[in-house]
Amino acid sequence: MDRLKQSLLDAPIIEKDGYHYFVHPISDGVPMLEPELLREIVIRIIRKAELDEVDKIVTPAAMGIHISTAVSLMTDIPIVVIRKREYGLPGEVALSQETGYSENEMYINDVHEGDRVLVLDDVLSTGGTLRAITDALEQTGADVADVLAVIKKAGPNELDDTDMDVRTLINVDVADGEVVVVDDQGDH
């Protein structure tokens, strides 16, 4: 059994406002992230993602940063971190991020018209974050070459009604207080 699948099966579940969450090193930073798990995930991302002529990896703060950094080190593709803080730099693009539990403003810098980007995130759950990011990138004139989330949580999400395909490494659900693997190969 692969490390990602086993780590999800072992993940504790918490409830917040009626929503069930798994607590996992990729999505939460706890428990600690073992290098073997990160290495496995990075290798699978590199094999699965459309990286041809990608200029930049675009990732939201905070939980996409460690994954994107490791992918960047292996591919020599630079990273753009979408921040929750406004810097006021020329070309900065604001976006509204809505998730199952919060709403925030986020800001993209260093992505320009014609840039070919990979959007990389930890979890696809409600789709609010990835939808806001891809919409904002399209407004800048960037070419979204691919969108990849390590883990997809079952259920409807905001990308279902779009033509945006999201690749995932593993698809899970939370049922009866535990993680259930729906598809250990993910989407695409």
Swiss-Prot record:
Superkingdom of origin organism: Archaea
GO biological process: purine ribonucleoside salvage
Disulfide bond keyword on record: no
Swiss-Prot/TrEMBL keywords: Purine salvage, Transferase
Pfam families, per the entry: Pribosyltran (PF00156)
One GO MF term attached to the UniProt entry: transferase activity
EC number: 2.4.2.-
The keyword Transmembrane appears for this protein: no
HAMAP family from the UniProt entry: Hypx_phosphoribosyltr
Record's function text: May catalyze a purine salvage reaction, the substrate is unknown.
Recorded family membership: Belongs to the purine/pyrimidine phosphoribosyltransferase family. Archaeal HPRT subfamily.
Protein's name according to its UniProt entry: HGPRTase-like protein
